[in-house]
Amino acid sequence: MFDDVIAEKLKELGITSNEFSELVIRMLDYGVINREESQIETRLYDRYLQVTDLVEDYLSVLKVKIQHDKKFCFIRIYPPGAVVPGLPDDEHNAFNSGFRAKPSQQEVAVILTLRVEYEKSLREGQVDDKGCVLLPVEGLAIAMKNLLKRSLPEVLGERKSIFKRLRQLRLIQFNSELEFESADSWISIQPSITSFVGDEVLSQLYPDETTKGLIEDVL
């Protein structure tokens, strides 16, 4: 019955069931769609705008939360029970694991540092028209050392793995040919990081540098 209702509404919108399935599967598989990421995600994001209500109804059955940033054109989904800034909490659901593996401690440290650096650039007006912030890898390493007393991995393969993971989460972007050992290497921090690391965590990190308690709780 539910499928019949969806099929009927899709027909009215001129969207095929395969196109709808492609969109939903991509959202569940990747957890995020960023219109600026690629031609594929541009197409899927635009399709989402056509079927927003249907996708929300469909995923609400699974108690999946959808966060849609219309300004920077990205969608991120969260599992049932996840605490999401700006979205109501589900107090009656104990499930709180992600669709994919949670970030490692090292990844969390990099993410927190990126969030602080993004906030600094935002306050200084050093954000481009797409809401992105350019940061040299060397600058990230220094900031991470100063803020959290941690270092980026010395092994290049481990360092690349972290950055690829963060790109998968649509938190950063970089040239595929980038070698992360060069002082001239740059990454682009994406605006979606503001929803990934909420204001409560940020307030403990910036401008107050007393982060020992936060590190013990998060890392």
Model-found features: residue ranges?
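Eukaryotic partner-binding/assembly regions in large regulatory complexes
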Residues: M1-N96
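Leucine-rich, amphipathic alpha-helical/linker segments
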Residues: F2, K9, L13, S17-L23, ...
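Short alpha-helical segments that sit at the start of domains
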Residues: I6-I15, H92-V133
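Short acidic, hydrophobic short linear motifs in intrinsically disordered regions
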Residues: V32-R43, G125-N146
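Short amphipathic alpha-helical interaction segments
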Residues: L49-V55, R150-Q168
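A short, conserved structural fragment
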Residues: V61-H68, F163, R167-F180
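Accessory beta->alpha helical hairpin/"wing" motif in late/C-terminal subdomains of nucleic-acid enzymes
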Residues: C73-P79, Q173-V201
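Short, amphipathic alpha-helical interaction segments positioned at domain boundaries
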Residues: V84-G98, I189-L219
